[in-house]
């Protein structure tokens, strides 16, 4: 089964990395069994280090991986003799990295990280002679073992175009998988117009050129899946938990598919810079509200708001756009999100927002999301060209097409009309 995913490391000027997963086969049952034992030992080593960090209070007294190596390397080698020295170092690197990530994200309120699956990070000391069909792995007790993997057509293209880098290996459902990483050089950014993008709940994206994306069928299906999830959680039986796991996978895949459709629709436009709001802390800042009880102010959770907000793939839209845009010579930038939906993009006195309508101070009725998108792009580039978001004039795509219009026709239509004024109904 083919499983490909793409990830971006560093800023846009740094090389991008494409990761491709393929099935891995060992030459004999003995080597396969031994390598599985190695992965289990590496998992136990990770969990041992994680529990050790908890005892020494790593949360408040951090150690670098070099400090951990100098203090606990001999102890770990003696406790896990099956692991070679480089495997121990990789386990230390992974454990320290995960702990630092947890501390940066949740500070003190996180449980001790525990590794449940079999996987290991490889480097040049743990593998060699990587070709488009074989790889030699270090297997304790067997030295270097030549293993083969399935070279899918897309993987063959990556080998022909790009240089492979480090690999990872993991074990899932009785099968070894090899993750091969390729360095992708960025295309030089092309100077051009900027497009402001406002993300929302019902309207997934609204743009400063008078267009937007809303898929009512997708929203309906998402509400249905959420209702089924609540029903299954209430039953709390073994079969309901199994069904719930399958339902979560379905919801995740459909959301991911919708995100890719939205991003492809955005990239089909004739803009080279996409401006988004920096919503990295939006859930923390809006998850609670202050009310007055008996003359005292009290913070309470906004449960309904949080449940609806958790259904929106805000970060996934940004991440997907950030790795696809540089491949086309385009870029993604973020701006401060404060007051983008409350201020008038024409620099007039502050108006009033009522649902999807924005009542400007001069009596003009604007589309609230369109006004926010204009504020976003003007905050990054004040001389940007925007289309006046008059209420009722926005052109939305992504709805179920009653005329049988295909997705390709829709992209072509948007691409040809994106350079024309879209402010008129």
Could you tell me what each predicted segment is?
Residues 67-172, 307, 311:
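Acidic carboxylate diad motif detector
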Residues 2-93:
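Gly/serine-rich nucleotide phosphate-binding loop at the start of the catalytic core
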Residues 15-22, 26, 33, 173-425:
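Positively charged, helix-rich recognition surfaces that bind polyanionic ligands
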Residues 4-6, 116-117, 389:
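N-terminal cationic leader/targeting segments used for protein routing and processing
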């Amino acid at each position: 089964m083919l499983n490909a995913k793409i990830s971006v490391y560093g800023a846009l000027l740094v090389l991008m990395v494409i990761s491709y997963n393929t099935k891995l086969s060992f030459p004999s049952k003995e080597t396969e069994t031994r390598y599985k034992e190695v992965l289990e030992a590496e998992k136990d080593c990770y969990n041992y280090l994680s529990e050790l960090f908890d005892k020494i209070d790593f949360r408040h007294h951090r150690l670098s991986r070099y400090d951990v190596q100098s203090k606990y390397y001999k102890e770990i080698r003696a406790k896990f003799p099956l692991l070679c020295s480089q495997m121990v170092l990789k386990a230390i690197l992974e454990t320290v990295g995960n702990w630092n990530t947890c501390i940066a994200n949740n500070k003190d309120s996180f449980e001790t990280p525990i590794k449940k699956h079999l996987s290991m990070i490889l480097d040049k000391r743990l593998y060699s002679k990587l070709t488009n069909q074989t790889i030699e792995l270090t297997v304790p007790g067997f030295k270097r073992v030549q293993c083969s993997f399935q070279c899918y057509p897309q993987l063959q293209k990556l080998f022909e175009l790009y240089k492979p880098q480090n690999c990872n290996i993991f074990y899932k459902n009785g099968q070894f998988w090899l993750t091969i990483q390729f360095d992708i050089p960025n295309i030089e950014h092309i100077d051009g117009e900027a497009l402001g993008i406002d993300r929302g709940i019902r309207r997934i994206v609204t743009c400063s050129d008078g267009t937007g994306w809303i898929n009512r069928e997708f929203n309906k299906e998402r509400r249905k899946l959420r209702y089924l999830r609540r029903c299954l959680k209430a039953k709390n039986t073994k079969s309901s938990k199994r069904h719930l796991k399958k339902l979560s996978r379905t919801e995740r895949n459909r959301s991911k598919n919708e995100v890719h459709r939205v991003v492809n629709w955005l990239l089909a436009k004739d803009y080279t810079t996409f401006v988004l709001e920096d919503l990295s802390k939006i859930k923390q800042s809006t998850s609670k509200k202050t009310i007055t009880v008996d003359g005292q102010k009290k913070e309470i959770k906004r449960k309904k708001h949080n449940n609806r907000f958790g259904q929106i793939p805000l970060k996934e839209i940004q991440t997907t756009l950030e790795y696809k845009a540089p491949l086309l010579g385009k870029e993604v930038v973020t701006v401060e999100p404060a007051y983008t939906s409350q201020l008038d993009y024409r620099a007039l006195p502050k108006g009033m927002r009522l649902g999807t309508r924005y009542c400007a101070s001069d009596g003009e009725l604007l589309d609230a999301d369109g006004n926010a998108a204009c504020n976003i792009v003007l905050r990054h580039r004040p001389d940007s060209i925007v289309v006046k978001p008059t209420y009722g004039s926005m052109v939305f795509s992504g709805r179920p097409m009653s005329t049988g219009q295909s997705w390709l026709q829709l992209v072509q239509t948007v691409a040809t009309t994106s350079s024309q004024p879209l402010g008129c109904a």
